[in-house]
Amino acid sequence: MSGQEKSDKSVDMWSFLRCLGYLSSFNLLVAVCLGMYVRWEQTSEPMILVLFILGLFVSAIACILYYYFSMESASLSLFHLWFGFLQGLLCFLNSPSLEDEIKEQVTNYLLLSSVSIRTLWALTERLCANPKYKPVVITSSELLELLGFGVASISLVFDKSLAMIALTFALTALIIDLRMKSPLALPNLACFSVIAAVTFFQSLKIQTNPFALSCYLGRLICEPLLDVYFSSLTATERWKQFLSAGRLWRRFSLFPLALVELLFFVVCAFKLGNLKDWYLVIPGFCIFGLLWILCHMVFLVTLWCFHTKLSECQKMWAAQRLQTLNLDRIMASRGMRHFCLISERLVLFCLMSTIILGAVSWQVANGLFMSVFLVVLPLESLAHGLFHELGNGLGGTCVGYAVVIPTCYSSADGQPVLLPPGQVQELHSTSTLNAVQRLFSHHLIQTFGCDYSTSLSLETLLVKLRSFLELCTAEGPRHDTYILYYSGHTLPSGDWTLAGGDYLRMKQILDMWREQNSSFSSRLILVLDTENSAPWVKAVRKVEGMYVAVQGAKLSPVQDAEGQDAPRLGDFTSEWVKYNCDPESGVQWSERGRVISAIYGVSKPWSDYALHLPTGSDVAKHWKTHFPKTTYPLVAVANWCCGLNLLWLCSVCLRCVRRLKLSWFPPSILDTGQGIKLVRS
């Protein structure tokens, strides 16, 4: 297909989508006008006629602003605000006498066709037009239609109007929950639909128009619901507006949240007025109410601590922004993933306590209780979704240690010998050390140290390695990844040559790693820029019970000695760092005839590796650091939930498949998930 044909096809698709959008809005306009006319005809209420004429007048103004003054935003704002208001009136101004009216039936069919065409338009756009998703919490059109519907509910008596306004807030929170792709968004949608359809309007004793209500809800929900599947935004992109907001704004947002939670507890307490089953109601409310209070103390403290850690990440992001570091990489380096994994469980307990208290205090005749309950559920599931996304999407913590031995070469007996000063610069070891430091800095890897010395003895190196391998994060757990870099001369077996004729074997490193990592699941990555790294690459493939990888290099002899320089130690590091720090560097490891080729090997269980999940001791330590002692009894419940693994059989099968795939078909590029890729030529 030629470029012109593709362009014509895209124009045709865009025209078709615009026609669908206009047709849906036109059907809604006709339905609203006809519905308002029928209600005025039945009741002869002058206010309905005034609102109907005013609606036509506002629609005309919106069209004039759109077509004659090119004020699209103002025109669409008027349209959505007014039509949200009129749809609300269609819902509430309903009576049994309208059911047999032909015009009312036509109105209902137009409303159904409007929501159906709207859904078809949204689905077609996502399937065929490849829309560009923007990181918005809620669109202006959705917000204006919700505002208009809330204003229309003022036509009811005060208590019913209050419940309807609260239900509008619940719908707003539900739309945000869906757009953020919270794991509990779909259960919340089902809960909202069931409660609203079965009990809420019955408790208010108002007869609504189900077609108008379905049209209103369907038009608002269809796009966020489809985006749960179609949206390609990452977690940090979806939450961008919140994560990049200022510290004061984020902390201030806790106060309305706390007020909503307090309002929920108050309306739950209305249940105590039912003295019919007092022997069940009073003890149940006291027990589960106390549990709810403890859990929500934890909830608010967790959010406060999260804002504190996020503010630290934002400060670091602002300082490093010229280096093109994204916020999620900074959050990963600051241990935000571990904090979010623990917080996810704590917020889940809070959500469960809310559901239990709501069930114990259920009030069939209280519409305000139901609407506030429907507000609280998506708000708490939003917090759970945020911690879930960050806990599963952020990378783990990483620490690195580099050893560069610059001014020596190995004699036949393995004894390091100093080079003349004239040849020291030829080894360009200083640039090698700078490249490693650039790698650590670019990927926010905590630097344990960079040893640059010719007199490094085996005893000194073993002490430093032991200290490096037992290093932990500031929060207490071990780092997820440990990177050990070595550039220098080796024996033919790959062992490192050190001062005094000593050498360091791979077995010594693995023994120390096994000793330090016996009760944990961290991984060790060895990066070797040596002449003889192949023996270690082969040896690591036989290692069991540990997550170890070796990235090595092969230095091939030059075919044309006059036209090409011989490869030197440090050349591989320069290319490998450039490849891992600059995606557009153009380094191609698969090209033929390379004098510097890459090889890597991983231990047998490498594919089983998963980032560290908080243990019971981690949860307990987190609790003692951030929460009051009155909440300690909930630690036992947290530890019990940590041990649950309901899908263990599926995980075993997937583990076997991943192991076979990695051993039989190792990829040419293996992403470690830390921003660093292992490569082979």
UniProtKB/Swiss-Prot annotation:
Keywords: Glycoprotein, Membrane, Nucleus, Transmembrane, Transmembrane helix. It is found in: Nucleus membrane. InterPro entries: TMEM168. It is a multi-pass membrane protein. The chain crosses the membrane at residues 16-36, 47-67, 73-93, 135-155, 156-176, 184-204, 252-272, 281-301, 346-365. GO terms for cellular component: nuclear membrane. GO terms for molecular function: sodium channel regulator activity. CDD domains: TMEM168. Glycans are attached at residue 517. It comes from the Eukaryota. Plays a key role in maintaining the cardiac electrical stability by modulating cell surface expression of SCN5A. Belongs to the TMEM168 family. This is Transmembrane protein 168-A. It comes from Danio rerio. The gene is tmem168a.
